[in-house]
Amino acid sequence: MTIKTGFDPDKFVQEAGDAIIAANSEGLIIFWNKAAERIFGYMTSEVLSHSLDLIIPERLRKRHWEGYQQVMQSGQTHYGSEVLRVPAVHKDGRHLSIAFTVTLLFSDDAHIHAIAAIIRDETARWDEERALRQRAAGIEAKNS
């Protein structure tokens, strides 16, 4: 039995407040929602079929791709239920702090077709925490 709800999953994914991005087995972007446009500054038309390197800081790319390939080969990731917090890069070059989880998308023949991530921009929170840490360190230095 199908219940008619008026719910449109495609619209939900496009309109979600968090970025939803998917990349194929080579790391090329195959899906980019409106929140991804807002967070990273790239329009969907600018990123489709381009590498995730657009949003990965250069210093972290080697480590990212090693992990990406390991997931592609093993078919397993522990970031599906764990939130990963990492730096990212906006189109204009500014640094972002993002938090995300991933899900593996399998093809009918049980091979990984893509990895999808749900991403939240936590830059403001990160900046606030850094300022608090610096302030606490200053207070400790004065009291030493």
Predicted stretch roles:
Residues 7, 126-144:
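Sensory-domain boundary/capping and coupling elements
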Residues 44, 56-97, 106-108:
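PAS/LOV-family and closely related PAS-like sensory domains
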Residues 100-102, 119:
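Sensory-domain boundary capping and coupling elements
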Residues 111-124:
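PAS-family sensory domains
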